[in-house]
């Protein structure tokens, strides 16, 4: 073995790529000139960039922190609101304006974002990075009845 070439530091070899045999082609060149064997090269697929674990998650966090659009899709949220309204309105079917649904969705997403921020602070206080259910429960308990939804 060469110096500095340990089994862990050597590059792994890739298996040889199979190359399909060249396709028979008819040449449109003049018959007096011999044509070189034409080889078609397959388009080389560029390998996807590999990120270290956690980098992609941080990129996603930064992307969503910069954006201002709603993160919950409108149709499922609308169905959920109508279902909850049917439950509490004794079977009456209310009609909703689209602006009212958007305002409710905006408020609910702001509430969830703030709850997750507080919950993550609770997990950091416990010297953890992973968010647990108990962190969310603690954040809601600290907020109280009015801010933590009961």
Curated annotation (Swiss-Prot):
One of its GO terms (cellular component) is nucleosome. Residues 25-37 have a biased composition (Low complexity). Residues 42-53 have a biased composition (Basic residues). Residues 53-150 are annotated as: H3-like. Residues 1-56 are annotated as: Disordered. Disulfide bonds: none annotated. It comes from the Eukaryota. This is Histone H3-like centromeric protein A. It comes from Xenopus tropicalis. The lineage of its organism: Eukaryota, Metazoa, Chordata, Craniata, Vertebrata.
């Amino acid at each position: 073995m060469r110096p500095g070439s340990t089994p862990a530091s050597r590059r792994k070899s890739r298996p040889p790529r199979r190359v399909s045999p060249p396709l028979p082609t008819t040449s449109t060149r003049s018959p007096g000139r011999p044509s070189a064997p034409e080889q078609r090269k397959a388009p080389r697929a560029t390998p996807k960039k590999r990120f270290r674990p956690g980098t992609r998650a941080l990129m996603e966090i930064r992307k969503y922190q910069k954006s201002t659009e709603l993160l919950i899709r409108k149709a499922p949220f609308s169905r959920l609101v109508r279902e909850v309204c049917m439950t509490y309105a004794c079977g009456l079917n209310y009609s909703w304006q689209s602006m009212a649904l958007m305002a409710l969705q905006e408020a609910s997403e702001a509430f969830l974002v703030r709850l997750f921020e507080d919950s993550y602070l609770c997990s950091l206080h416990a010297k953890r990075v992973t968010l647990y259910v108990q962190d969310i429960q603690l954040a809601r308990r600290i907020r109280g009845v009015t801010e933590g939804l009961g």
